[in-house]
Structure formats: C-alpha cells, structure tokens
Amino acid sequence: MKNEPVIVERVYNAPIEKVWKALTDNNEIKQWYFQLENFKPEVGFKFEFSGGPDDGPQYLHLCEITEIVEGRKLTYTWRYDGYQGNSVVSWELFEQGEQTRLKLTHSGIESFAENGPDFAKTSFNGGWTYFVNDALKNYLEAGV
C-alpha cells in the first residue's frame, strides 16, 4: 500500500462555529458519529469507541488528541486495541462566508495493512466518506 492518506473534503451550509461544535461537543458528536464517553477537546485527552463493518466484527479504536486549534483544527492518534499500526486523523475547518469547508485527513493507514481487508484503504475511504458526506452533512443541514 502506498503511503497516501485518505482525504475527504466537503462544504457545508453551516457556519464554522456550528461545524466545530459538531466535532467537539460530546452531546453533538453522538448524534452523527459515535458515542464517546465524556469527550473533551483537550490535548492529551484519550477516548475510545467500537466500530467496524455493518456485517462484520467491531474493533476497539484507541485515540488521543494531539492538537487543538480552537474553531479550526482537531487532530488525534488512531489505533486499534490488539492490532499493529498507528495513524493520525485531522479535521480542519475553513470559513467560506456563511459556509464551512471541512478537510478530513487520515494518514498512516498503511501501518494497518497486515491486519486484514477490514483495514484496507478502501474501507477507510468508504467510512470517512459516509461520515463527512452523509452523517455530518445531514446533521448540520437538518432544517436548513
């Protein structure tokens, strides 16, 4: 596998403050992403959640926030309990008038290649495309 990150970008009909809140407020995160226990947008905060293919095994994701730029960027490590590999997920926001452009980058996924087909780049691409283009969009733009 080439060392190319998964990158998914989307423009939302929502102000940047609303998108940031959807990414960092525990009550909002669970509406479109995963249930995260007491999530706090602070460097060093560790969180975990289970997820995987709808018809397959669920994997325990282990994450730690490494960078916060208030209202603009959230970065955290991403690995799996009991599996080799480490990666980094970054959510970046860019104001575009009354809209917001989001850029999701998941780098280092090649380190999971030996763990099986659920860890293939196509799997990550499909998952992130769903969360960025469908789940988050529908949450942010409901009632717009």
Give a label for each model feature.
Residues 1-38:
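Hydrophobic ligand-binding cavity/cleft-lining segments
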Residues 1-12, 16, 94-105, 144:
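Aromatic-glycine hotspot motif
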Residues 3-4, 43, 57, 85:
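Residue-level preference for beta-strand/loop junctions
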Residues 6, 30-37, 49-55, 77-79:
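A short gly/proline-enriched turn/hairpin at secondary-structure junctions
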Residues 7-13, 40, 48, 64, ...:
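Generic structural detector for well-ordered beta-strands
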Residues 19-20, 29, 47-49, 65, ...:
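Hydrophobic pocket/interface hotspot
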Residues 38, 55-101, 107-110:
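Hydrophobic-ligand binding "helix-grip"
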Residues 101, 108-144:
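A conserved amphipathic terminal alpha-helix motif
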